[in-house]
């Protein structure tokens, strides 16, 4: 254990604030561009409004004072939380006022969730489809009903109260954001005190947060869900406060409650095994994880995080110092190792944000897979439309976060990187052999691209020539994903050894039986074959290209052979000035711009793979004799092995519903499908445009206005190159995502 000298410890964990550092001035805030001297002068050209949006949240450009930047970010976090609370409150309010939640609760297998009723202004009420239970509305696929049932909400009054609570929290967060910037603003050393921050985040936020949630799950969710599963009528289920205040109600369901806390203090914890379970698998009534397993998990997580929060050295001379951990972290081939990273992460919020976004984005994609492999909420697994939508949602959110990680890493390199601090450490060494990294990665991308695409081209050719025996397929030349099958197998078998007390395997997707709920498949083993091997290599190709673009942007953000002084040009610039041809699209920003297209590219294929695979091999109905009928009848293995198969049997075949939706409750998706294609096509006008073309056009239009004496005071300007690209990529992604939304929804709501 390390004992530290007192002089280095005296500044730890003292809450240090400045009083009233920045006056609250509505007059100042009302002036557009008040944060930037040149913007505050007002608009001379139309470029002003673009710069206003570009710089409003770019705190680095408002001031170079790290303390003030830190306070602005901290305060903005509270504002962000307030917005999230208002947003959640609005959704919960819809559930209370405009939904069929209680009808769904009493018959979740036959009633579909709806929380939006369209007003009949010019006939829009056609969108209010019959969702069962005598209710007409738009079917929602957000999974909120399943979440609310998991929470233990049994009536709409509870939803009203929760919605009001969300608004109260939003108000508190707004107040906190104002208070901690204008009244009591933390000093820089408070933001840089990483050990105290880790203690607070790990123990209080994650540890106590999980502990509090475990308490809710044990005292409210588990008993409520147990009664709902048993078919008890909603009006007969005790309310949450009754479970909490009347121990007898819980004792009836979980007898160990009668023993109170005695088993806890006598270390006889096994007595609590009736509500802290280790069942594994899914609840056969709801197709969701066991509520008591989830409670057990959150209790364990809480213990881990509370212990983790005690590891770091603050007021007392015991525990770890992050700086010491980093500076001692040297390997035989890493030079100075992690020396200097502490300075990077405590003086650059971009560096901090880049790592957080990369981790959180990766985690979000992992969550997408958990939602079908281990469905956490009751009746989620059999609501195929919701399953497809939350998978797609988490995949895309994860992609955006990862690209954001690369963006802020590049901004860190341009604005915050200090070569003096990073001498022969891991970051410096990576930068010094970046050519080897990028050229090898480029080779990998070319290899993967030609080989993965080549397998499909081979199959299309053989099928065109009528030679099925020569296809790469499960019935022709097999290319079985043997490593993936091996991993599935060991995960199916391992729990017998690693978790001998669990009653069921962790997830049915690795192997085991089919779980049906109400005649629909909730979970089943996902067998992998040649078709998955082929598409997996397309995934590998597109992900590697995305990484190539983003990593090149980060590693060459400060300099390159082409532009050695790139750091002086900033994070975003169109070209290296007039007179140097061939230097466009090299800025850090441009790599993010290009990376976004490949992110969208790669993740579209991921969600297409998931959608078709699940409809073909997992989702479907189960007859009384156990016969399973899948939605697309198992056509994935033979159709997904050719490009023509993807076009004909997936895109075209499954677009039937959206194309034929006019005149039905799904017609909005038909309009969206059309409109989003237009938005996507509109983006190309910005992406394939020349700035001079538009400037010439604008000047002739301004001439005409001058002739008529109606010339504008603010001079119109064509979009800059970067503005055009930003508008283009935004519409490209919006159009693409909304097209996919309409395509998926119309199809899965019809057949699912």
From Swiss-Prot:
Keywords: 4Fe-4S, Chlorophyll, Chromophore, Electron transport, Iron, Iron-sulfur, Magnesium, Membrane, Metal-binding, Oxidoreductase, Photosynthesis, Photosystem I, Thylakoid, Transmembrane, Transmembrane helix, Transport
Domain of life: Bacteria
GO biological process, one term: photosynthesis
Subcellular location: Cellular thylakoid membrane
Positions annotated to bind [4Fe-4S] cluster: 575, 584
Residues at which chlorophyll a' binds: 677
Reaction(s) catalysed (UniProt annotation): reduced [plastocyanin] + hnu + oxidized [2Fe-2S]-[ferredoxin] = oxidized [plastocyanin] + reduced [2Fe-2S]-[ferredoxin]
Residues binding phylloquinone: 694
Assembly and oligomerization: The PsaA/B heterodimer binds the P700 chlorophyll special pair and subsequent electron acceptors. PSI consists of a core antenna complex that captures photons, and an electron transfer chain that converts photonic excitation into a charge separation. The cyanobacterial PSI reaction center is composed of one copy each of PsaA,B,C,D,E,F,I,J,K,L,M and X, and forms trimeric complexes.
HAMAP family noted in UniProt: PSI_PsaA
Protein name: Photosystem I P700 chlorophyll a apoprotein A1
Species of the source: Nostoc punctiforme (strain ATCC 29133 / PCC 73102)
Gene name for this UniProt entry: psaA
């Amino acid at each position: 254990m390390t004992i530290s000298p007192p002089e280095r410890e005296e500044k730890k964990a003292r809450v240090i604030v400045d009083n009233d550092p920045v006056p609250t001035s509505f007059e100042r805030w009302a002036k557009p561009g008040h944060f930037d001297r040149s913007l505050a002068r007002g608009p001379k050209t139309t470029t002003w409004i673009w710069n206003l949006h570009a710089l409003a949240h770019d705190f680095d450009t408002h001031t170079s004072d790290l303390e003030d930047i830190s306070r602005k970010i901290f305060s903005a976090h509270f504002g962000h939380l307030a917005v999230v609370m208002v947003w959640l409150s609005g959704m919960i309010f819809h559930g209370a006022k405009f939904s069929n939640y209680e009808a769904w609760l009493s018959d979740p297998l036959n009633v579909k969730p709806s929380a939006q009723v369209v007003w009949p202004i010019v006939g829009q009420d056609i969108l209010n489809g019959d969702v069962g239970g005598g209710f007409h509305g738009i079917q929602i696929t957000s999974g909120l009903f399943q979440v609310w049932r998991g929470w233990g909400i049994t009536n709409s009054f509870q939803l009203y109260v929760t919605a009001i609570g969300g608004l109260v929290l939003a108000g508190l967060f707004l107040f906190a954001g104002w208070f901690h910037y204008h009244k009591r603003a933390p000093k820089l050393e408070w933001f840089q005190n990483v050990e105290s921050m880790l203690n607070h985040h790990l123990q209080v936020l994650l540890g106590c947060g999980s502990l509090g949630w475990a308490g809710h799950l044990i005292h409210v969710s588990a008993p409520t869900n147990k009664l709902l599963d048993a078919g008890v009528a909603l009006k007969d289920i005790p309310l949450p406060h009754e479970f909490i205040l009347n121990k007898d109600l819980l004792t009836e369901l979980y007898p160990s409650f009668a023993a109170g806390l005695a088993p806890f203090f006598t270390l006889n914890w096994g007595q609590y095994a009736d509500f802290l379970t280790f069942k594994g698998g899914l609840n056969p009534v709801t197709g969701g994880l066991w509520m008591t397993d989830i409670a057990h998990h959150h209790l364990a997580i809480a213990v881990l995080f509370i212990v983790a929060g005690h590891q770091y050295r603050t007021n007392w001379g015991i525990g770890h110092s992050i700086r010491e951990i980093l500076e001692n972290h040297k390997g035989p081939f890493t030079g100075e190792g992690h020396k200097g990273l502490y300075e990077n992460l405590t003086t650059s919020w971009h560096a901090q944000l880049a790592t957080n976004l990369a981790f959180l984005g990766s985690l979000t994609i992992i969550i997408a897979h958990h939602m079908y492999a281990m469905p956490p909420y009751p009746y989620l697994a059999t609501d195929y439309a919701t399953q497809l939508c939350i998978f797609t949602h988490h995949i895309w959110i994860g992609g955006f976060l990862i690209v954001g990680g690369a963006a802020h890493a590049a901004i860190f390199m341009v604005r915050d990187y200090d070569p003096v601090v990073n001498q022969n450490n891991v970051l410096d060494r990576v930068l010094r052999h970046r050519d080897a990294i990028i050229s090898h990665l480029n080779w990998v991308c070319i290899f993967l691209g030609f080989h993965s695409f080549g397998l499909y081209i081979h199959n299309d050719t053989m099928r065109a020539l009528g030679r099925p025996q020569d296809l790469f397929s499960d019935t022709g030349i097999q290319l079985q994903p043997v490593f993936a099958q091996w991993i599935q197998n060991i995960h199916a078998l391992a729990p017998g050894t690693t978790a001998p007390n669990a009653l069921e395997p962790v997830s049915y997707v690795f192997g085991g039986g089919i779980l049906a709920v109400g005649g629909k498949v909730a979970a089943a083993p996902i067998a992998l074959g040649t078709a998955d091997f082929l598409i997996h290599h397309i995934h590998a190709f597109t992900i590697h290209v995305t990484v190539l673009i983003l990593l090149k942007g980060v590693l060459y953000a400060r300099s390159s052979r082409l532009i050695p002084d790139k750091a002086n040009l900033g994070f975003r610039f169109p070209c290296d000035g007039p007179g140097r041809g061939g230097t466009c699209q090299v800025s850090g920003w441009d790599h993010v711009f290009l990376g976004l297209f490949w992110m969208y590219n790669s993740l579209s294929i991921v969600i297409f793979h998931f959608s078709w695979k699940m409809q073909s091999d997992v989702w479907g109905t189960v007859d009384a004799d156990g016969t399973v009928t899948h939605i697309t009848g198992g056509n994935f293995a033979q159709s997904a092995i050719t490009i023509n198969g993807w076009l004909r049997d997936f895109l075209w075949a499954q677009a039937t519903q959206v194309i034929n939706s006019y005149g039905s409750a799904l017609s909005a998706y038909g309009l969206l499908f059309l409109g989003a294609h237009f938005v996507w096509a509109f983006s190309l006008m910005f992406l394939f445009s020349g700035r001079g073309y538009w400037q010439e056009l604008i000047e002739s239009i301004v001439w005409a206005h001058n002739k008529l004496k109606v010339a504008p005071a603010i001079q119109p300007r064509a979009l800059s190159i970067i503005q055009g690209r930003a508008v283009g990529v935004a519409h490209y992604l919006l159009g693409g995502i909304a097209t996919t939304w309409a395509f998926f929804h119309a199809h899965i709501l019809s057949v699912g």
